[in-house]
């Protein structure tokens, strides 16, 4: 691990690290040989045919971009004296800005906001939560579900993308529900 934006140092005792921050933020990077807590897989389809990113570049047609997430962090918790194996509750938000070469943009498990020139797409997924709760989509009404993927479809001319971004929070409790109205969902709160 190395400090990338300062001279602050840390001391280490086993896996515990203590930084001498003097009240300042620390920016660091490092490498690990451990599996990431969540694996993200991005798949691209053109007119229903799966393609590699370099194959789809420059092509036109009905494009689908699917973000699948696999939660790799299981833990054991005890509730009322019984032990349960549950996934760490991660909430993942994936977003992108699509230019005007993308039309008829739709997203599963997300929202599309257009300013006339660009479409901002934000999707939310909570991989592993259904398994931890031992529920399936059929346990919910059609208006409620626990999303585990994000899928964007659009008609595209000369496909290219600048970037996508994903943010992962360890638990949905980091979101504030204070202003969530009865008719809204967590996605509405995130996309405000």
What spans do the regions from the language model cover?
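Conserved small/polar residues in nucleotide/adenosyl-binding loops
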Residues: 178-185
């Amino acid at each position: 691990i190395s400090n990338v934006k300062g001279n602050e140092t840390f001391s280490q005792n086993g896996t515990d690290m203590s930084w001498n921050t003097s009240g300042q933020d620390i920016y660091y990077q490092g490498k690990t040989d451990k599996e990431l807590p969540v694996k993200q897989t991005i798949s691209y389809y053109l007119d229903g045919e799966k393609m590699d990113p370099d194959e789809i570049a420059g092509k036109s047609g009905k494009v689908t971009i699917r973000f699948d997430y696999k939660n790799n962090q299981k833990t054991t918790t005890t509730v009322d004296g019984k032990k349960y194996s549950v996934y760490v509750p991660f909430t993942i938000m994936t977003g992108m800005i699509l230019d005007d070469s993308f039309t008829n943009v739709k997203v599963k498990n997300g929202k599309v906001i257009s300013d006339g020139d660009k479409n901002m797409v934000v999707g939310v997924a909570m991989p592993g939560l259904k398994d931890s709760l031992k529920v399936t989509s059929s346990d919910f009404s059609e208006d409620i579900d626990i999303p585990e993927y994000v899928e964007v479809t659009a008609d595209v001319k000369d496909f290219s993308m600048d970037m996508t971004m994903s943010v992962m929070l360890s638990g949905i409790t980091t979101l504030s529900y204070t202003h969530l109205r009865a008719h809204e969902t967590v996605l509405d709160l995130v996309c405000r």
